[in-house]
């Protein structure tokens, strides 16, 4: 059950190394390292698992009183632009880029539209 953690985010096999409980934990952990104001943007690529991951994230964020906004299917740069231009606290994008369809991944976006991963991944993964 491979889970790949790198500077570009987290990637894993759908429902195996990247399962619903992990998605919820990562969403909540990301919220904890994000600024306290503003919503967390949620986006995805065209993989079907992204729909479920967004629902899981909404629920997980609501449990800790964090609001989210869903932009659904958009490229990562569009999600980054939305985070920055709308003043959101950050963003979570479910995408696995070039990986096979049985994979998905998570990219974390900071409030200034840049990848948050190099700063936050150790904290997020320790939760």
Segments predicted by a language model, with ranges:
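A residue-level detector for conformationally permissive "hinge/kink" positions
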Residues: 1-4, 35, 83, 97, ...
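An N-terminal, well-structured beta->alpha segment
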Residues: 1-64
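Generic structural "secondary-structure junction" signal
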Residues: 12-16, 76, 108-111
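General structural signal for secondary-structure boundaries
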Residues: 19, 75, 115-116
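N-terminal small/polar loop signature for handling phosphorylated ligands or for N-terminal nucleophile
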Residues: 40-103
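Acidic/polar active-site rim loop that often engages polyanionic ligands
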Residues: 99-114
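Conserved small/polar residues in nucleotide/adenosyl-binding loops
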Residues: 117-122
